[in-house]
Amino acid sequence: MDKAKQIYLEFKREADFLELDFPLFLGDGPGFGELCMDYSEQDGYMLYGYERGKRNSEFKTTDFEEFKYEVFLHICWYMGMEFELRHWKEDMRHDDNILETDTRKIAFEKTLQLLKMVNPAWIDKAAQGYTAYLNLWRENKNVYFDKEAMEFKVNS
């Protein structure tokens, strides 16, 4: 078995064990924007979107742990976004300055909860990026991640 397939099956087993969706293809997918992975001696580990015969947003590394983090971050993020869509309220007034109306908060919290199941050590790194994103359009850059409660909050 080649190395790419071995890694793919290892990730799939772990995702199945943790009851995570596994929207990852080995090599190029059908071409409708799928999340794909591959490995080569020259480029190392690769994670990318595959759409219309082209690799997009390709992430490459030779560090296996960094690659595993990125794979599971993407898998958990997909599930977090799906969770957000199920909890979207059409009648809610959306305002980037009111954290409770920012549905990205819900998606990111769910993503971090799922990621914690895979590897709790990854929470801080992922939470930093999501906190920066939630603060991006806010007038007061006061969102922080409460690791104990596993939710984003606002400093008063």
What are the language-model segments listed below?
Residues 1-41:
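N-terminal "first-domain core" detector
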Residues 10, 14, 70, 114:
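Residues that form generic nucleotide/phosphate-binding pockets
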Residues 15, 45-49, 89, 93:
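A generic structural signal for ordered alpha-helices
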Residues 43-79:
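Intrinsically disordered, low-complexity regulatory segments enriched in Ser/Thr/Pro
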Residues 80-156:
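Intrinsically disordered, low-complexity, charge-dense segments enriched in Lys/Arg
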